[in-house]
């Protein structure tokens, strides 16, 4: 699988920005520069919705969307759509699809003047915005669609996110508008979809291995299985001679990937196999830096239980605690500080 060999922004001399700036459209590194060194896989993070968010936050589009969300007639149409597929939201249920009712309702939606105006304006903005081009291209990629489906399935099993997704399913446009204005929810959704965080490289990984282009490295099976949470595949790779501490071109080991993604079982398998918990990548980030920055609390606990150092600094002189603070991972900060003072 191809990897991004661009210069890692952690080496930048720029000063850190504020927390609010770190939530802007481009993820910030520990030194305040844009993240450019991506984990193996897609160079463009198809799950970073920040560009689309900026378009949807356009005052005129937001005003129209809010009007539609509050429009009783439009909400009635949304209810009709839900009734046309009555079992769609039930776990394990097969939809009882009423095609005629669905088509009739969609025709009414499309003839709603406000909806048509908003859709046309939004469509024009999306097509004309150069920053949205890679987003649209990525979602036409079958690998991205498969990865999206996989992440959505995980989100529906997440105890924190499941109630939110259920409410959006049940509440329609009004529920969507409610959560679109909630930065904490957007942050959780972004983390669940693998969006990058401040202080660390982009985490995006494609669901299937790509053919390595000339001059680019191919991702090892150990790295790939650890990234995707394939426990049995990882065990098989190690049993067949895979190197538990193999490094990619950026110096990252399988444990870096497993901890960055929160793949606890894979991290445990690697540690049981003797993987170094204090391995450093080319920017001196340890697996604990990754787990802390991405808020993977269980992986942080596992690493600490197995002797991971809390005080090691990366090239930007940031400890795992610093990276956790930079990304507002408060529960992780408490855990790390407790260990540091033992």
Swiss-Prot record:
| Consequence of substituting residue 296 to A | Reduced binding to phosphatidylglycerol (PG)
* Cysteine-cysteine disulfides: none
> Pfam families this protein is in?
Ank_2, STI1-HOP_DP
Q: Which keywords does this chain's UniProt record carry? A: ANK repeat, Chaperone, Chloroplast, Cytoplasm, Lipid-binding, Membrane, Nucleus, Plastid, Plastid outer membrane, Repeat
GO molecular function per UniProt: chloroplast targeting sequence binding; glycolipid binding
- ANK repeat copies, ranges: 217-246, 250-279, 283-312, 316-342
Endoplasmic reticulum recorded as keyword: no
**Signal peptide start and end residues:** none
Knockout mutant characteristics: Lethal chlorotic phenotype when homozygote. Reduced levels of chloroplast proteins, including outer envelope membrane (OEM) proteins. Defective chloroplast biogenesis. Reduced APX3 levels and reduced targeting of APX3 to peroxisomes. Compromised peroxisomal function leading to increased sensitivity to aminotriazole during seed germination and shorter hypocotyls in darkness in the absence of sucrose.
| InterPro entries with a match to the protein in the record | Ankyrin_rpt (IPR002110), Ankyrin_rpt-contain_sf (IPR036770), STI1/HOP_DP (IPR041243)
The effect annotated for residue 223 to A is:
Reduced binding to monogalactosyldiacylglycerol (MGDG)
Q: Classify the source by domain of life.
A: Eukaryota
**Which parts of this chain are annotated as the region Disordered?**
1-41
Query: What does this gene product do?
Result: Exhibits chaperone activity toward chloroplast outer envelope membrane, mitochondrion outer membrane, endoplasmic reticulum membrane and peroxisomal proteins, by recruiting specific proteins containing a single transmembrane associated with an AKR2A-binding sequence (ABS) and subsequently binding glycolipids (e.g. monogalactosyldiacylglycerol (MGDG) and phosphatidylglycerol (PG)) present in the membrane of the target organelle.
Subunit info here reads: Interacts with TOM20-4, CYTB5-E, CBR1, APX3, APX5, TOC34 and GRF6. Binds to chloroplast outer envelope membrane (OEM) protein targeting signals, as well as to chloroplasts. Interacts with OEP7. Binds to HSP17.8 via its ankyrin repeats, this interaction enhances chaperone activity and chloroplast binding. Also interacts with HSP17.4A, HSP17.6A and HSP18.1. Binds specifically to two chloroplast glycolipids, monogalactosyldiacylglycerol (MGDG) and phosphatidylglycerol (PG).
What this protein is called in its record is: Ankyrin repeat domain-containing protein 2A
């Amino acid at each position: 699988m191809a990897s991004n060999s661009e210069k890692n922004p952690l080496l930048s001399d720029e000063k850190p920005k504020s927390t609010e700036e770190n939530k802007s459209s481009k993820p910030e590194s520990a030194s305040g520069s844009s993240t450019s060194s991506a984990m193996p896989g897609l160079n463009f993070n198809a799950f970073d919705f920040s560009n689309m968010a900026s378009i949807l936050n356009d005052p005129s589009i937001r005003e129209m969307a809010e009007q539609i969300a509050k429009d009783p007639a439009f909400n009635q149409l949304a209810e009709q759509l839900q009734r046309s597929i009555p079992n769609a939201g039930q776990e394990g249920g097969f939809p009882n699809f009423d095609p005629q009712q669905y088509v009739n309702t969609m025709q009414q939606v499309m003839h709603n003047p406000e909806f048509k105006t908003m859709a046309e304006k939004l469509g024009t903005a999306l097509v004309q915005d150069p920053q949205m081009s890679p987003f649209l291209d990525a979602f036409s990629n079958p690998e991205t669609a498969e990865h999206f489906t996989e992440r959505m399935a995980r989100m529906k099993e997440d105890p924190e996110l499941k109630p939110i997704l259920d409410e959006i399913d049940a509440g329609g446009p009004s529920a969507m508008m409610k959560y679109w204005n909630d930065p904490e929810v957007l942050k959780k959704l972004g983390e669940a979809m693998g969006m990058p965080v401040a202080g660390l490289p982009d985490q995006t990984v494609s669901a299937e291995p790509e053919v390595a282009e000339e001059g680019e490295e191919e991702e090892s099976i150990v790295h790939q299985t650890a990234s995707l949470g394939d426990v049995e595949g990882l065990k098989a790779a190690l049993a067949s001679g895979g190197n538990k501490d193999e490094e990619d071109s950026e110096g990252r080991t399988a444990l870096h990937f497993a901890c960055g993604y929160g793949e606890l079982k894979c991290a445990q398998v690697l540690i049981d196999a003797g993987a170094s918990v204090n391995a450093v990548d080319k920017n001196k980030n340890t697996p604990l830096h990754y787990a802390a920055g991405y808020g993977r609390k269980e992986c942080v606990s596992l690493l600490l239980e197995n002797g991971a150092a809390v005080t090691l600094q990366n090239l930007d002189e940031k400890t795992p605690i610093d990276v956790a603070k930079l990304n507002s991972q408060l529960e992780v900060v408490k855990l790390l500080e407790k260990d540091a003072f033992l």
